[in-house]
Regions:
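Sec-dependent bacterial lipoprotein signal peptides
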Residues: 1-19
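Beta-strand-dominated extracellular/periplasmic modules and repeats
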Residues: 21-141
């Protein structure tokens, strides 16, 4: 009887394997952009692109430091850019600057509403398409 089970499952096996695997052969593509809050450039912070499993994306997060002019460039680990796919976006920015190495951490108030720190609540989504550099700007209110 095991051969009957195998005959039933064998035609479906490639589909099951394909669903469980992401396309890791696509290299990261450069992603840059600008973050504004209430119409003005956000002057510091971090932006994080988290793969959106509801849209079939998986893999590593990409993140970038927001510079004084509101611009950012993403990195995924040591690589510049982000892998093609769908992402949920979070943005965090605090008043002041982070402590120097060896200095104790002190609480610093957020410059943004807390919803922007949560990928489920931020309302920020995007798709990174493969094959070309992209500029993705986000206007926060």
């Amino acid at each position: 009887m095991p051969t009957t089970w195998l005959r039933r499952c064998l035609p479906v096996l490639p589909l099951v394997l394909a669903l469980g695997c992401g396309d890791s052969s696509q290299p990261p593509v450069p992603v840059t952009g600008k973050i504004t809050y209430r119409g003005l450039p956000l002057q510091n912070g971090t932006i994080v692109f988290t793969p959106d499993p509801r849209k079939g994306s998986s893999g590593n997060m990409a993140m970038g430091e927001i510079k004084a002019d509101g611009t950012y460039s993403l990195r995924t680990g040591k690589d510049f850019g982000a892998a093609p796919g769908h992402y949920r976006i979070t943005v965090a920015a605090v008043l002041g600057s982070p402590p120097s190495p060896g200095q104790p951490y002190t609480y610093q108030p957020s410059l943004l509403p807390e919803k922007y720190r949560d990928p489920e609540l931020s309302g920020l989504f995007c798709e990174v398409k493969g094959g070309f550099a992209q500029a993705l700007d986000f206007n926060l209110d």
